[in-house]
């Protein structure tokens, strides 16, 4: 699904450039679209504790440059962070629809690449991605990426109202 979302974006950029692009250029396009987004929301600090399957997130985010301290509970670090964002950072409600993660190389110091697809309250499915040597932070950064992408992508047009049927006079 991520390929279906990124493909048209990459094709538009290739068309704009008017030439084929290298693998490095394609990767740079991906990073610009998914990894490097810090507006309108950026992660400033993140901490999570868990006891008996309940996790509490304490974090601070920058919303359009203003620091906002957030706190939330959930059944895992991602759920706790989502709860905190929605309840304390003026972020529109959303749910996590898909979560995937992979290592970028071998070894204990390898960076993790996390992919998260969110479903917004207006039924859009938006992907985000995050990279960090800490797998939890990679996931949190992916949430931020998806939220930022959702904030900058227009909502689908409203459906037109159904036609009104007026009976003809007899």
Which stretches of residues belong to each language-model region?
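Terminal or standalone catalytic/regulatory effector modules within metabolic enzymes
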Residues: 1-170
């Amino acid at each position: 699904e991520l390929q279906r979302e990124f493909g048209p974006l990459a094709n538009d950029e290739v068309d704009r450039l008017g030439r084929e692009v290298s693998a490095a250029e394609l990767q740079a396009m991906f990073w610009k679209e998914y990894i490097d987004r810090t507006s309108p929301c950026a992660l400033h600090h993140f901490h999570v504790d868990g006891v008996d399957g309940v996790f509490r997130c304490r974090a601070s985010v920058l919303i359009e440059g203003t620091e906002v301290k957030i706190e939330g509970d959930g059944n895992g670090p991602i759920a706790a962070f989502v709860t905190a964002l929605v309840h304390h950072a003026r972020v529109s409600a959303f749910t996590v629809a898909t979560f995937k993660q992979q290592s970028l190389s071998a070894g204990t110091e390898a960076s993790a690449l996390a992919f998260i697809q969110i479903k917004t309250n207006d039924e859009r499915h938006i992907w985000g991605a995050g990279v960090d040597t800490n797998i939890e932070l990679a996931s949190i950064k992916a949430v931020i990426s998806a939220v930022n992408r959702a904030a900058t992508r227009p909502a689908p047009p409203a459906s037109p109202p159904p036609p009104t049927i007026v009976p003809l006079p007899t």
